[in-house]
Amino acid sequence: MEALAGETRRSTGGPSKFPKVITVPHEFVALSMADGFARLTGKPQCVLVHVDVGTQGLGCAMHNSSIARSPVLVFAGLSPYTLEGELRGSRTEYIHWLQDVPDQKAIVAQYCRFAGEFKTGKNVKQMVNRALQLATSDPKGPAYLMGAREVMEEEIDEYDIDQEVWHGIEPAGLSPAGVENIVSTLVQAERPVIIVGYTGRNHATVPLLVQLANAVPGVRVIDALGSDLCFPFSHRAYIGVRIGKHAAISAADAILVIDCDVPWIPTQCPLAKGVKIIEVGVDPLKQNMPLHYIPASHRYKADAGVALQQLNDFLSSKHPALVQQEPYAARWAALEQTRAEEIAAADRLAAPPSSPDTDAASTSYLCSQLRKTCPDNTIWCIEAVSNAMFVYDQLRVDKPGHLVNGGGGGLGWSGGGTLGVKLASDYLANGESQIGAEGKGSFVCEIVGDGTYLFGVPSTVYWVARRYKLPTLTIVLSNKGWNAPRISMELVHPKGHGSQVSNEDLNISFSPTPDFSGIAKSASGNTAYSAVVRTASDLLRVLPEAVAAVQSGVSAIIEARVHGSSPWKGDEA
C-alpha cells in the first residue's frame, strides 16, 4: 500500500506503468476473476492475498486454475521473521505470531506450476519472471510467490533486466512418424471419433479442427469438457459436449484424444474390442493425477494447434479430396442427416410447456430463449452442473472464445470468472491498451446452478461488478438444491435407500429457498436488475428487460425456477 500511495503521489498525470489494482473483498472471487481474464487473453494477472489466511481463502479457486490450465500469479505475504526490530519490517502486531506457520506455500503448492519465496529484494524481478515462465508454459496454471515484510522493506538499487529472455516454452509439434500414424489411423477407420477438451483455449485451433473433420469425412467430434468452445455446434461432424460417455465412443474403431483429461469413464462407457486409441496433448500422462490411464497405443506430447496444422498439411498432400471418394462421400452425406436429427431432438426438448402461464420453463426451453434474446456476440460462462448438457445443446455456440466453463471441480468459479471474462472482453475491445474499458466488449451471460451460485460468494461478485462497471446477465437455475450429489449416489446405488427418498431427506434441499436475485441486488447497492421467473410466460417478459438492463450498464440477475424441481410451496412461490 505504501508503494501504491507513493506511485500515485509521483504521478504527473501521464499514463502510469503501475499495475491497475482491483479491490475484491473475497480471495476466491479474486482468483476466479483472474482465471476468467486469462481464459480470454492468455495473460496472467496477479492476485495479492494476506499471508496464510488469505492463501486459504483462495480455496478451490487454486484447484480450478490448475485443472483448467489457466495462468495466474498469486503473491502472499509472510509473517515477519524478526521480532526485536533487527530489520525494518520486524513484527509490530499481535497477529504476526499467530500467522507464522511452518510451511505456508504447502497450503497450495500441489496445485502450482511453481511455488517459491522472495528471500531478497535484489533478485525480485528474476523471481517474478521465473514464476511467470512456469505459469505460462504448458500445461499452464497458477504460480505462487510469498515474501516476508523484511524483504519487502529492503532498500535496493534500481535495476533493469531484459524481459525478452524470459518467455515460456514454445509450443512443440508431432514427430513425422506420429503425423503419419495418426492420419493413417483416421483415414483407415470406419467409425473414427476425435475427443477434445482444452483445444479451444487457443482460438486458432477451432478452424484447424474443422479442417481436419472436413478432410476425413465421417469422423465425429466430441468435446468431453466444455471448458472452451472447441468445435462449432452447427458442424455436421459435431456430437456436442458429452461428459464421460456416448454411444459413438463405445462404437468407435479409432479414437484420437487431443488435450483431454477424461475422454470417457470406463465404468459408464465400455469401448469396442480392438479399438485403436492415440493420445496427443501437452500433458498426455497427466503428471499431477495419481491415477490416470487410457489404453492408448501411442502418446505424443505436442501442442494441439501445431499438431492439427501438421495433420492437415499431411492430409492435403497425401489424401486430398477424400470427400469425393467412397466410402467417405457416403459417410459425409450421412453425417448431415444424423446431425439434423440430433438438433431436431434438442429442439423437441425446448418446446414450451402446454400451460405457459402456470407451468415453469424447462432448462432447455429457458436456454433456447436465451439464445434468441441475447446478442449474437454473447460470451457464455457456464457452471450449470447437472443441467450443463441441456444448456450446451440449446445455446449452440459456433464462435471461438464465446463459451467458457470453469473446467474444475471447485464450484462457484462462474461468479468471479464471469467478471474476469467481461473485464477481458472490454480490454480486448480496447486494443489491449487499458484495463477497465467500460462496456466496450461483448455481452456476457452467466448460467449457474442455485447451489453453485451460493458457492460463488455473490455478495462480493455484485459489489465488484458495480464498482468497476462490469455489467453481466446472470441466470440462476433454481431447482431447490444440489441435484449433482443425488446423481452421484444413484450411479453407485441406483436402487438404494437414497433413491427412494426426497432431497429434503438427503439434506441437499434449499427449501425454503434464498432470495437469489435479492442477494445480488443488495450487494450491488440496489442498482442491479433482479427478477424471479416462475412460469414460461414470465420468462418471455423478463428476459428482454434483463438484456436491456445489462446493455444500459447495470448487472441483471434472474432466478429461473425450472421445471423438474420439487413443487414450490406457498411461502416460496
Model-identified regions with their sequence ranges:
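Active-site diphosphate/adenylate-binding microenvironment
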Residues: M1-A5, S11-T12, A333-A437
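Phosphate/pyrophosphate-binding active-site segments
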Residues: K119-K122, Y159, S184, G274-A384, ...
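N-terminal alpha/beta PP-like core and its mobile active-site loop of ThDP/TPP-dependent enzymes
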Residues: M1-K318, V323, D376, G441-F443, ...
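Thiamine diphosphate
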Residues: R10-P15, L83-Q99, I249-A251, K301, ...
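Generic recognition of flexible, low-complexity loop/linker segments
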Residues: A131-L132, E180-V183, L208-L209, I243-K245, ...
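Short hydrophobic beta-strand segments
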Residues: V193-G197, I379-E383, D450
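Active-site nucleophile and cofactor-binding loops and adjacent substrate-binding regions
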Residues: V21-S32, V47-G54, K119-T120, G226, ...
